[in-house]
């Protein structure tokens, strides 16, 4: 196993970002609950600890505090924002409410570079988010940097290798922030950079073989990035012991079923079973217009269809899943609990426990960007590795109102035009998502000398990093005009195309 950096989570919304930045430096990181016993961290062999930020004051009645014994483990520690205040509080310093709170952009002046700031310019732009500040240094510490309102924006205890910073190096707003993290990992902790795609694949293949033995593994394949990479990794490990089940729910994009069949059956030679349940899904969705009800019907029907499909496949001991690392982190309200608490992941897509299948989740240690790297290394085509997110209920949440075969056909054809033009123009891989939405509204149009009364299609194209926030993409007007012209001319039943220019928040990316 690779060397591990422990990230203790104290409720920061940026905890996952810290973990990702560490991995970008080819060092393995793992997020732990803030109260994780020091003994556990010692047993798991962590070579360094990062204390995350958090929304609380260290003096608050229910403020999250770590096991004090972590400071006796003899490993380097880096405190970020709330984390540096914890270090001050526990090690004999003093924390106080700042007279001028620091939020947003700020400026850092480095006084003593030391190992943390080695090789960096003396002055840097940083990103702040704190109301408290360190007012008195703990014994053994020295100030290394200052900001506008903090005389201790950077501190260090070289003997114990404890470092603290009163800003967020993990966000892109902080200039050279990743270099600071890298300095801590390599220069202070002595990390070997042994977390690579090649090494992960080798370890994952060995783990899958050890766990599965000669047993059969069933994987629900959607054609999306996560399930595709999981399928490729499982197949590399156990070959013919893997059977994939693809459910055609009638809510797929144009040509999707044929594409999946060609890719996995013919290219990867995976045992793929395709179940056509499109008529059943549409029958159960008939007359339903409420979004949440549609989602529940689609979810329940999928579970039922998938369970029946498994009976035709034959005996299997394991169910494979494309679970990712963010999936095993449960978001909870801030209070005495952190924003991200590691939990045992039991979400198997709603599949009944009576199936008594054990889980194999080969991607559960990875973030999305790492999954894409693994997919590329396993030989998956670019259009799969970099495929845009697609909702679980499929086009069912992109048809407003009742889902009918006719409405789906209109949406499917319009979406295909948008996809073609986004690919041809080179914008497909530059945006987070681009798709069409069918609106059950008829408007007056003119074709030739005849008046028409046809439907409206909305274009939704957004830019984002993690889907938590998003902004509408400013595509060239000429491209938008061409897309609109093609849809209204080539897709029967559409007379008007509109553009959604809403950001998230307040709008969500999907319409339902």
From Swiss-Prot:
<dbReference type="Pfam" id="PF02540">
    <property type="entry name" value="NAD_synthase"/>
</dbReference>
<dbReference type="GO" id="GO:0003921">
    <property type="term" value="F:GMP synthase activity"/>
</dbReference>
<keyword id="KW-0658">Purine biosynthesis</keyword>
<protein>
    <recommendedName>
        <fullName>GMP synthase [glutamine-hydrolyzing]</fullName>
        <ecNumber>6.3.5.2</ecNumber>
    </recommendedName>
</protein>
<feature type="domain" description="GMPS ATP-PPase">
    <location>
        <begin position="195"/>
        <end position="387"/>
    </location>
</feature>
<dbReference type="InterPro" id="IPR022310">
    <property type="entry name" value="NAD/GMP_synthase"/>
</dbReference>
<feature type="active site">
    <location>
        <position position="168"/>
    </location>
</feature>
<comment type="subunit">
    <text>Homodimer.</text>
</comment>
<dbReference type="GO" id="GO:0005524">
    <property type="term" value="F:ATP binding"/>
</dbReference>
<dbReference type="Pfam" id="PF00117">
    <property type="entry name" value="GATase"/>
</dbReference>
<comment type="pathway">
    <text>Purine metabolism; GMP biosynthesis; GMP from XMP (L-Gln route): step 1/1.</text>
</comment>
<feature type="active site" description="Nucleophile">
    <location>
        <position position="81"/>
    </location>
</feature>
<keyword id="KW-0067">ATP-binding</keyword>
<dbReference type="InterPro" id="IPR022955">
    <property type="entry name" value="GMP_synthase"/>
</dbReference>
<keyword id="KW-0315">Glutamine amidotransferase</keyword>
<dbReference type="InterPro" id="IPR001674">
    <property type="entry name" value="GMP_synth_C"/>
</dbReference>
<comment type="function">
    <text>Catalyzes the synthesis of GMP from XMP.</text>
</comment>
<feature type="active site">
    <location>
        <position position="170"/>
    </location>
</feature>
<feature type="binding site">
    <location>
        <begin position="222"/>
        <end position="228"/>
    </location>
    <ligand>
        <name>ATP</name>
    </ligand>
</feature>
<dbReference type="Pfam" id="PF00958">
    <property type="entry name" value="GMP_synt_C"/>
</dbReference>
<keyword id="KW-0547">Nucleotide-binding</keyword>
<dbReference type="GO" id="GO:0005829">
    <property type="term" value="C:cytosol"/>
</dbReference>
<feature type="domain" description="Glutamine amidotransferase type-1">
    <location>
        <begin position="4"/>
        <end position="194"/>
    </location>
</feature>
<dbReference type="InterPro" id="IPR004739">
    <property type="entry name" value="GMP_synth_GATase"/>
</dbReference>
<dbReference type="InterPro" id="IPR017926">
    <property type="entry name" value="GATASE"/>
</dbReference>
<keyword id="KW-0436">Ligase</keyword>
<keyword id="KW-0332">GMP biosynthesis</keyword>
<dbReference type="InterPro" id="IPR025777">
    <property type="entry name" value="GMPS_ATP_PPase_dom"/>
</dbReference>
<dbReference type="InterPro" id="IPR014729">
    <property type="entry name" value="Rossmann-like_a/b/a_fold"/>
</dbReference>
<dbReference type="InterPro" id="IPR029062">
    <property type="entry name" value="Class_I_gatase-like"/>
</dbReference>
């Amino acid at each position: 196993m690779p060397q591990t950096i422990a990230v203790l989570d104290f409720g920061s919304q940026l905890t996952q970002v810290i973990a990702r930045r560490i991995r970008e430096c080819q060092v393995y990181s793992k997020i732990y609950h803030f109260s994780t016993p020091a003994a556990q961290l010692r047993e798991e062999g962590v070579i360094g600890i990062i204390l995350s930020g958090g929304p609380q004051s260290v003096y608050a009645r229910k403020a999250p505090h770590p096991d004090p014994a972590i400071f006796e483990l003899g490993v380097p520690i880096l405190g970020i924002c709330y984390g540096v205040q914890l270090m001050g509080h526990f090690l004999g310093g003093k924390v106080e409410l700042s007279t001028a709170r620091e939020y947003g952009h700020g400026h850092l002046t480095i006084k003593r570079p030391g190992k943390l700031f080695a090789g960096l310019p003396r002055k840097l732009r940083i990103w702040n988010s704190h109301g408290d500040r360190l007012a008195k240094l703990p014994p053994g510490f020295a100030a290394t940097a200052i900001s506008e309102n903090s005389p201790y924006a950077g501190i260090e205890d070289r003997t114990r290798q404890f470092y603290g910073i009163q800003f967020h190096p993990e966000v892109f707003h902080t200039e050279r922030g990743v270099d600071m993290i890298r300095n801590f990992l390599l220069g202070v902790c002595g990390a070997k950079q042994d977390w690579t795609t090649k090494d992960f694949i080798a370890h994952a293949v060995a783990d899958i073989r050890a766990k599965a033995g000669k047993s059969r593994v069933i994987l629900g394949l959607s054609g999306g990035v996560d399930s595709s990479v999981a399928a490729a990794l499982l197949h590399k490990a156990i070959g013919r012991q893997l059977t994939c089940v693809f459910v055609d729910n009638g809510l797929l994009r144009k040509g999707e079923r044929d594409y999946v069949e060609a890719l996995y059956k013919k290219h990867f030679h995976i045992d793929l079973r395709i179940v056509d349940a499109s008529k059943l899904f549409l029958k159960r969705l008939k007359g339903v217009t409420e979004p949440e009800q549609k989602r529940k019907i689609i979810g329940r029907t999928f579970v039922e269809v998938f369970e029946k499909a498994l009976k035709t496949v034959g005996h299997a001991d394991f169910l494979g899943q494309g679970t990712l690392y963010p999936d095993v982190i449960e978001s909870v309200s801030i209070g005495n609990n952190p924003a991200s608490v590691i939990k045992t992941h039991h979400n198997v897509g709603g599949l009944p426990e009576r199936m008594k299948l054990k889980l194999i989740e080969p991607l559960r240690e990875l973030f999305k960007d790492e999954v894409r790297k693994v997919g590329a290394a396993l030989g998956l085509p670019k259009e799969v590795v970099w495929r845009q997110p697609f909702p679980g209920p499929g086009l069912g949440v992109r048809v407003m109102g009742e889902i009918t075969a006719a409405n789906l056909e209109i949406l499917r054809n319009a979406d295909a035009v948008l996809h073609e033009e986004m690919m041809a123009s080179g914008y497909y891989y530059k945006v987070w998502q681009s798709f069409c939405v069918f609106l059950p509204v008829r408007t007056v149009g003119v074709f030739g000398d005849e008046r028409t009364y046809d439907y409206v299609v909305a274009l939704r194209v957004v830019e984002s990093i993690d889907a938590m926030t998003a902004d509408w993409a400013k595509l060239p007007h000429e491209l938008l005009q061409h897309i609109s012209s093609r849809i209204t001319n080539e897709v029967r039943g559409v007379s008007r195309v509109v553009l959604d220019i809403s950001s998230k928040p307040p709008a969500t990316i999907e319409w339902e």
